[in-house]
C-alpha cells in the first residue's frame, strides 16, 4: 500500500481478484534500504484498506492460516479472501518463521536486521555441521524488527528487491 499511489485502486483490486478467484494480500510499505524520498509521505496503514473494503463489501476476520505473516479476512458480498501484512502497525515478529537466502548465497534471518551469514563459506562443512549452523542461525533470529516510518531512519543497508520478501 502506498499513499497517493494506489490508495484509490484498493476496491478495484479487491473486485478484480474476486472476479478472477485470486487471493490477495495488502502489505504496508517496509522501511528497508535508504531511499531518496520521504517514507512518511508514502505510508498507508492496512487499517485504511480494511476500512475501505469493509464499507464497500463487508469484511470479517477468518481462521485461514498459511506459513506467512498475513492475517486473513473474508468479504461478505464478494466471498473472497484477503490477507493483510502490517509490519509497522501490528508487528508480527513473534510468529515469523521466515528466513531469506539471496541468489549469491547470503542468508538473512530477518528482513528488519542487517545480520547475515554467507552460506557459501559454510557449504564446505559436512551436512550435519551445515544443518547445525543453519539451525543455530534460525534459533538466534532477532526477537523483533525496529521498523519506523520516519524519514531519517532506515534499518537495513539492502533493498527488498535484493533480499526477497
Where do the language-model regions lie?
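Short flanking/linker segments adjacent to small metal-binding domains or redox-active Cys/His motifs
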Residues: 138-165
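Accessory C-terminal segments flanking Radical SAM cores
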Residues: 32-148
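Short, electropositive alpha-helical surface patch
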Residues: 6-23, 78-90, 161-165
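Conserved C-terminal portion of the radical SAM core fold
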Residues: 1-36, 51-59, 102-104
Amino acid at each position: 500500500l502506498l499513499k497517493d499511489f494506489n490508495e484509490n485502486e484498493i476496491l478495484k483490486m479487491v473486485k478484480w481478484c474476486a472476479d478472477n478467484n485470486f487471493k490477495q494480500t495488502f502489505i504496508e510499505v517496509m522501511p528497508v534500504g535508504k531511499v531518496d524520498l520521504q517514507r512518511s509521505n508514502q505510508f498507508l496503514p492496512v487499517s485504511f484498506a480494511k476500512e475501505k473494503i469493509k464499507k464497500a463489501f463487508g469484511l470479517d476476520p477468518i481462521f485461514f492460516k498459511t506459513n506467512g505473516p498475513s492475517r486473513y479476512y473474508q468479504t461478505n458480498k464478494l466471498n473472497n479472501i484477503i490477507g493483510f501484512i502490517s509490519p509497522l502497525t501490528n508487528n508480527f515478529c513473534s510468529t515469523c518463521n521466515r528466513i531469506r537466502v539471496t541468489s549469491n548465497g547470503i542468508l538473512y534471518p530477518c528482513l528488519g536486521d542487517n545480520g547475515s551469514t554467507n552460506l557459501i563459506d559454510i557449504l564446505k562443512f559436512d551436512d550435519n555441521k551445515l544443518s547445525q549452523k543453519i539451525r543455530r542461525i534460525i534459533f538466534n533470529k532477532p526477537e523483533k524488527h525496529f521498523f519506523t516510518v520516519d524519514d531519517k531512519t532506515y534499518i537495513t543497508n539492502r533493498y527488498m528487491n535484493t533480499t526477497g520478501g
